[in-house]
Amino acid sequence: ELSRNEQDEFIIVYLGDDSTDFRLELTYLKNRTEAYDLGEQEFHLALRTVDIGAAHDRHEKMGCICFENHGMGIYFIEDPDGYWIEIIPDRTKPITWR
């Protein structure tokens, strides 16, 4: 376990292999009573980029951005099968949207 974020409504745990930058994020929603449905996008792949602005510009031109959260500095793209992929910035650099 690399780190943990515990809030009233959820717990997020980050796992890693201690030899690469790979991180697996596991999210537990505390108040959820029903089973997860894949269509709800609770399970998704996230990719980190060193230049979030350039990545955003490229994805915007491709027309594949399906959700943006500028406050969190993230956005999602949708693949041809309808799955969402989260694009996250390298947190060691300032977030700049073009």
Predicted regions and their residues:
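A short, acidic/glycine-rich surface segment
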Residues: 9-11, 30-36, 95-97
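Core segments of cupin and vicinal oxygen chelate
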Residues: 1-23
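Short amphipathic alpha-helical surface micro-motifs
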Residues: 6-11, 26-30, 58-59
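Conserved beta-strand termini and adjacent loop/short-helix elements that scaffold enzyme active sites
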Residues: 2-4, 29, 69
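Vicinal oxygen chelate
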Residues: 18-20, 34-84, 89-95
